[in-house]
């Protein structure tokens, strides 16, 4: 599945009558399949916390479904407003272990286009080192730009 198909799928999910969590799960699965990634999750960001709202079924719920906004790779993405790509999480002290099998991770902030505030994150994980290329990062940043609608609808 190509990234244009994924973007259309995200837009379709956002326009559907599904609830926010159901939309997040559907979108996470679309992204996971497009890049052959092992796990994808979507998180809401508040002033204090990062909170999981939906993820792919396998390997399951994240070990940290909510954590302080200043922690982990997600905290770094929120603080900078930029994607964080780590191709060996065992070498990065910011990494919060969600799954023992994760070796590479990308966190992409979802930004409110009106205020520039980070309102969510797209978390993509792989069981392989060096799994993410710049093309992956660019595609995921494109997905995050469309994802704003998931958070706008919730009043985030």
Label each residue range with its predicted role.
Residues 3-7, 11, 120, 125-156:
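Juxtadomain coupling helices with adjacent low-complexity linkers
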Residues 9-17, 25-34, 76, 146, ...:
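Amphipathic alpha-helical regulatory segments at dimerization interfaces
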Residues 34, 97-103:
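Short loop/turn motifs at secondary-structure junctions and domain boundaries
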Residues 39, 107, 121:
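Short hydrophobic/aromatic beta-strand element in the GNAT-like acyltransferase core
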Residues 44-98:
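Regulatory sensory and allosteric helical modules in signal-transduction proteins
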Residues 104-114:
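A short, aliphatic-rich beta-strand micro-motif
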